A protein has these predicted regions:
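C-terminal ends of transmembrane alpha-helices
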Residues: 40-53, 104-121
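Alpha-helical transmembrane segments and their helix-start/interface "positive-inside/aromatic belt" motifs
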Residues: 88-96, 153
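Hydrophobic cores of alpha-helical transmembrane segments in multi-pass inner/ER membrane proteins
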Residues: 3-18, 69-78, 137-155
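Hydrophobic alpha-helical membrane-insertion segments
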Residues: 93-108
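Membrane-proximal helix-loop-helix units in multi-pass membrane proteins
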Residues: 20-87
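Short, membrane-exposed interhelical loops at transmembrane-helix boundaries
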Residues: 116-136
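Membrane-interface capping segments at transmembrane-helix boundaries
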Residues: 16-23, 153-168
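Cytoplasmic-side transmembrane-helix entry/capping segments in multi-pass membrane proteins
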Residues: 1-4, 26-36, 92-95
Length: 171
């Protein structure tokens, strides 16, 4: 399962810094932020899975995963960006928080693997559910999408000429 982590992180980072990533980073900032809103319903589904005993509780917002904040605030921050009312400091802060929360859940997921078992070795505390279909799409697709989204927004916000510049609604 640890082998899933390398492509989950390396591929979206490589794509984010490629020519295609340059094109994608040129999308309106509001779109780049809004793309992270999928994390809100995802966290609700994960909470339900934990309530049903299908995944470890530490990987939900009732445990140690507060990634739901990124999904919920993406909607508000994207709307502010679309209206031209999201100051650059807000976008930088939001992306830093979202990136940090993503790193936290990645650490929790790895620490919950059977080989590590940092949260205990009881079956309910072990992260084995992502090895089964359709849950394998969580690390393979959705985590990669979240990583790519943050890389693209960082690239956009830190590109030359954008520093210190106010963002117009469609910039």
């Amino acid at each position: 399962m640890l082998l899933l982590l390398l492509p989950t992180l390396a591929l979206p980072v490589a794509l984010g810094f490629s020519r295609i990533g340059s094109l994608l980073a040129g999308a309106p900032v509001a779109w780049l932020v809004a793309s992270q809103s999928f994390r809100l319903p995802l966290e609700l589904v994960m909470h339900r899975a934990a309530s049903d005993g299908a995944m470890p509780p530490q990987m939900t917002f009732t445990g140690s995963n507060f990634d739901i904040v990124t999904g919920a605030t993406a909607i508000v921050v994207a709307a502010l960006a679309a209206w031209g009312r999201a100051p650059r400091w807000l976008l930088l802060s939001w992306n830093a928080l979202g990136t940090a929360l993503l790193v936290v859940i990645l650490v929790i997921a790895v620490a919950s693997l059977p080989a590590i078992g940092a949260f205990g070795h009881q079956p309910a505390r072990l992260n084995t559910w992502v090895a089964y279909f359709p849950y394998v799409w969580l690390p393979a697709g959705l985590v990669s999408a979240a990583v790519l989204g943050h890389v693209l927004l960082w690239r956009r916000l830190l590109q030359r000429g954008m520093r210190g510049r106010a963002l117009s609604p469609l910039s």
